[in-house]
Amino acid sequence: MTSGAAGAIAHAVRCVTKPGDEVLTFAPYFPEYNPYINKSGAVLKVVPADTSSFQINFEKFEEMLNPNVHAVLINTPNNPSGIVYSTETIKKLASVLEKKQEEYGHEIFILSDEPYREIIFDGVDAPYVSKYYANTLSCYSYSKSLSIPGERLGYVAVNPAAKDADVIVAMCCQISRGTGHNCPASLPQLAVSRCMGKTSDLSVYETNMNIIYDELVKLGFEVVKPGGTFYIFPKALEEDSIAFCEKAKKYDLILVPSDSFGVKGYFRMAYCIDTEKVERSLVALRKFVKEEYNM
């Protein structure tokens, strides 16, 4: 057990890398990965995005793979794009890494960041990474599925088929003492143990997503439809997404520019709010687009 998915990643990276090793992740990515990885002594490097689908950009990924890469950090369903990596994508990732392990003569671990695992929309293919790749460490948080983000409760799950799985589990038990990511308090652990296999009502997220997606398309935004999470990641109406989001503030719209996610020219919208608030926000969005961009 760890203090959320952040603690899980902090543990996992220290188990499978040493200082100076490279960890690859894929844009768009959660910006806090930088301190999680770099503070461990490993070095985070970011593979450019495939903005047509926000699936993995395999051409750029294979260009960046080298013998110093010891881990690949993925996030599916993804923050900020809302995209879920397909079974085809995960199978291809596994195939590439299996070949590179053999070529380089060492293991390459997937660190699978999965806090949004239960927030999957109807009909979306959402594979478990560990089913397709033995050297997988799954990093999970209960904060999204049970709507308890402040409780900081998660875990690292080591695939039993992973190389030296028993050693990695033992390492996780010791790492807490050195990182400050101590085990969560016993009371929330006890509470969550009584909620296993359950979630809060997550259906509102898909309702909100469909409302926002349809409106964005109607207004002329370029956007890939999310398959999960409570985020959507449209292309901004000008190249400078920071300027775009600053203008939106005048209309009481809080949008997050994409620069910190490793992509230029996009922005993130979150819709983990009541549907009534989503509908009211669209009135402001229409006004913003009309007055600032004549659309």
Where are these regions (language model features)?
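PLP-dependent class I/II
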Residues: 2-295
